[in-house]
Amino acid sequence: MTDATHRFVFENTDIRGNLATLSGSYRAIVSNQSLPVSLQPLLGEFVAAVALLSETLKYDGILTLQVRGNGPVPLIVADCTNDGDLRGIIELGEHQPLPDYSGLTLPELIGDGVLSLTVDPEHGQRYQGLVPLEGDTLADCLALYFAQSEQLPTKLWLFADQNHCGGLMLQGLPAQQVTDLDQRKEQWQTAVQLANTVTPDELFSLPANDLLYRLFNELGCRLFAAREFRFHCSCNRARGENAISSLGKEEAFALLAEQNGKIAVDCHFCGQHYAFKEEDLQRLFSGSMH
């Protein structure tokens, strides 16, 4: 199974983990964009992270991981539905492209910005957590987010190349199995030290069972059923209609005239094009467009 997450726990500890490996869905996401090769792994890290987090944060709806700033890469977004539908984009905006984006830290790429984690549930209230870009990597920033918001020790290892993305996540839980503070600290440090040895080659080539045995055999690891993921974009014509409607009738028809009788609405996630002509706007603003 090449596009899946695998939850696991360590026996007789209060530590849980999650493993993600994505290939087909990641390649589909990248293929819909004209990204510099040196930026593709960064998008892969965001896609892998949102897949891992989707198993940690229980929700019905959409989980969005986004960073926005004023640097060479002003916007990165990855989102995941509770059904395992993944999307992701990087936007360079008006910035002059760099010859090479590799080797730069996340704050150097984003500039003055903030990382947000948003849950849009199908029912209930929207939730958003914000964290400053105080770590060099996405994994560092997310660890800080969990330390501040959830007050749970959390560590991520994220990897990506042109064909695969994935990662490993460990999280300490409130005391249930083990109450001794020194023992809890020792178990956490051991798990992190073992996870630090993981390599991209292992992550992308070994079955989950084999990888977890290789990394954590001495801790006793229990693996749960895999959860599958795929690329799927939720865009549709109705969203384009809503965007045009939000302009108001006067501004919408002015835009129609500027664009020679056809308003184009493009989805940045999948490249789908939606065109709206005068008769479409007439129906929209008469209340009969569906």
From Swiss-Prot:
Redox regulated molecular chaperone. Protects both thermally unfolding and oxidatively damaged proteins from irreversible aggregation. Plays an important role in the bacterial defense system toward oxidative stress. Under oxidizing conditions two disulfide bonds are formed involving the reactive cysteines. Under reducing conditions zinc is bound to the reactive cysteines and the protein is inactive. The keyword Transmembrane does not apply. Gene3D superfamilies: helix hairpin bin, Hsp33 domain, HSP33 redox switch-like. Disulfide bonds join C233-C235, C267-C270. One of its GO terms (molecular function) is unfolded protein binding. Pfam families: HSP33 (PF01430). It is found in: Cytoplasm. GO terms for biological process: protein refolding. It comes from Teredinibacter turnerae (strain ATCC 39867 / T7901). Its main location: cytoplasm. Belongs to the HSP33 family. One of its GO terms (cellular component) is cytoplasm. This is 33 kDa chaperonin. The lineage of its organism: Bacteria, Pseudomonadati, Pseudomonadota, Gammaproteobacteria, Cellvibrionales. Keywords: Chaperone, Cytoplasm, Disulfide bond, Redox-active center, Zinc. The keyword Transmembrane helix does not apply. InterPro entries: Heat_shock_Hsp33, Heat_shock_Hsp33_C, Heat_shock_Hsp33_N, Hsp33_helix_hairpin_bin_dom_sf.
